[in-house]
């Protein structure tokens, strides 16, 4: 449709960006010759320079991010890509392996957001709990949370997209210790049947997930827990489904998202 608009003169340039262009740039060029520019999911600097006509500089106020959210909160991405290789997910193919941002870089953005009036930081990545593992000298999500907790103007820090297999005790303890970290966690478990979890390559069975939840709620009484599940996964039997249903009834998640495969 956009290509037709360009042919008719209603669109000056056709630009494609995101996961699709990251994975299939050559195929897009061949299939849609009207495309002028292709950007991958990590080409932020090139995109900004293309839009402004100016060379990107992260210290230039022109390039400070604009908020896409209401002014009191903002998402703070701490890493891009994923090393997990879950069988149902193509993120490593689309976005590559994990590339963590340094703590000083993240802190600089968080302080700029605070100066803009942001009071709640939502920490995100494909897997926040494996943050920093890709550095030669490893750092951990726990280290980052303790640093973010020192920013005076930030009042709340909310952690999203924790992987239960990577939820180390050091992270749980940091969440409990930091007064600005909300008693809330978004931790997708995907399923609760061991055969399905194994097929999904999740790295943790039902008992391990139960243990992580127990440790979380022991450290943070009143914790609000959100999760997501996949039903209808290939090979899922009625018994697998019933195990999942029973686990959900047992845990009583505060928020629950369910997707069909």
Task: For each feature predicted by the language model, list its residue ranges.
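Conserved SAM/AdoMet-binding glycine-rich loop
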Residues: 12-18, 23, 115-238
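Proteins enriched for Cys/Gly/acidic motifs involved in redox and nucleic-acid/cofactor modification
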Residues: 1-131, 170, 185, 207-214, ...
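Conserved N-terminal phosphate-binding loop of PLP-dependent enzymes in the Aspartate aminotransferase
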Residues: 153, 252-253
């Amino acid at each position: 449709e956009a290509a037709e608009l360009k042919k008719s003169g209603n669109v000056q340039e056709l630009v494609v960006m995101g996961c699709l262009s990251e994975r299939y740039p050559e195929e897009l060029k061949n299939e849609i010759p009207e495309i002028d520019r292709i950007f991958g999911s990590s080409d932020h600097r090139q995109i900004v320079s293309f839009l402004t006509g100016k060379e990107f500089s992260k210290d230039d106020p022109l390039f400070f991010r604009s908020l896409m959210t209401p002014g009191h909160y903002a998402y703070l991405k701490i890493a891009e890509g994923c090393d997990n290789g879950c069988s149902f997910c193509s993120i490593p193919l689309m976005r590559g392996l994990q590339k963590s941002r340094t703590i000083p870089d993240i802190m600089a953005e968080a302080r700029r957001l605070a100066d803009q009036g942001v009071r709640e930081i939502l920490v995100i990545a494909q897997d926040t709990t494996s943050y920093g593992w890709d550095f030669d000298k490893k750092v951990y999500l726990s280290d980052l949370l303790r640093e973010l907790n020192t920013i005076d103007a930030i009042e709340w820090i909310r952690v999203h997209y924790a992987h239960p297999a990577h939820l180390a005790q050091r992270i749980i303890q940091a969440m409990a210790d930091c007064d600005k970290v909300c008693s809330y966690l978004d931790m997708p478990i995907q399923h609760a049947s061991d055969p399905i979890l194994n097929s999904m390559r999740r790295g943790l069975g039902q008992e391990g997930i139960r243990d992580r939840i127990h440790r979380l709620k022991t450290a943070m009484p009143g914790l609000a827990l959100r999760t997501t599940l996949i039903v209808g996964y290939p090979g899922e039997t009625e018994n697998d489904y019933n195990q999942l249903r029973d686990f959900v009834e047992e845990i009583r998640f505060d928020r629950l998202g369910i997707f069909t495969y």
